[in-house]
Regions:
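Core AdoMet radical
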Residues: 1-100, 114-123, 143-147
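Hydrophobic positions in alpha-helices of CheY-like receiver
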Residues: 50, 101-108, 137
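Generic secondary-structure transition motif, activating predominantly at the C-termini of alpha-helices
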Residues: 51-54, 80, 105, 167-171
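Short low-complexity, flexible loop/linker segments enriched in glycine and/or proline
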Residues: 73-75, 102, 159-163
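Charged helix-capping and loop-helix junction motifs
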Residues: 99-102, 131-132
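Auxiliary Fe-S-binding modules of radical SAM enzymes
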Residues: 109-110, 120-185
């Protein structure tokens, strides 16, 4: 599921430790800090509690889209949420992730104003694979957001840094049709 470093640090699974009513007292916002809520055995109960709360739910971590099902998407669609973030860390997961993103879009009808997909670049991908993932996300009308692996050791002005600058500046990204077009500016 997660990369081995993240899995060793955070684990591969979430566990429900309490019902929402045990620590939530009607605030307008609920912020989820767990990217693996969908991996929890009690996911359905947790998602329904969040949906039924009426509060805005903030999925502020990159939710593992590989764990998305139609039922999970249907419940998430019923939540009051301003935004959800998914993670696409490895190009190798393309055949799993792309159908899941399409299914999520078909069920929720959410677009880039509500969906961001984190794209990890510079770990085990080529520039062509990075651009392909970004284009797939763009074609779905979701917002890609480039994160760089070991970014402090990537040279300033490098192709990866310029890719990150283009994609993460949403105004420029949606105005420039391609990375090549951006590079000519």
């Amino acid at each position: 599921m997660k990369s081995s470093k993240v899995a060793a640090k955070e684990g591969r699974k979430s566990y429900k430790v309490a019902d929402l009513k045990e620590f939530w007292s009607g605030q307008k916002y609920i912020e989820l800090l767990d990217p693996n809520t969908l991996a929890c055995e009690d996911w359905k109960d947790i998602l329904w509690q969040l949906a039924n709360s009426g509060a805005y739910v903030d999925f502020n971590q990159g939710v593992d889209i590989r764990l998305m099902t139609e039922k999970k998407a249907e419940i998430i669609q019923k939540m009051r949420t301003k935004h959800i973030h998914f993670a696409w860390d490895s190009y190798k997961d393309k055949n799993i992730i792309v159908p899941k993103l399409k299914m999520f879009k078909d069920i929720t009808n959410w677009e880039r104003s509500k969906v961001t997909v984190y794209v990890l670049c510079g770990f085990d991908t080529t520039m062509e694979e990075n651009l392909e993932r970004i284009q797939i996300i763009r074609d779905l009308n979701f917002n890609p957001y480039v994160t760089l692996y070991d970014s402090q050791h990537i040279e300033r002005g490098s192709e990866l840094k310029r890719l990150q600058r283009w994609v993460n500046n949403k105004w420029v990204f949606w105005k420039c049709g391609s990375f090549d077009e951006y590079m000519k500016m």
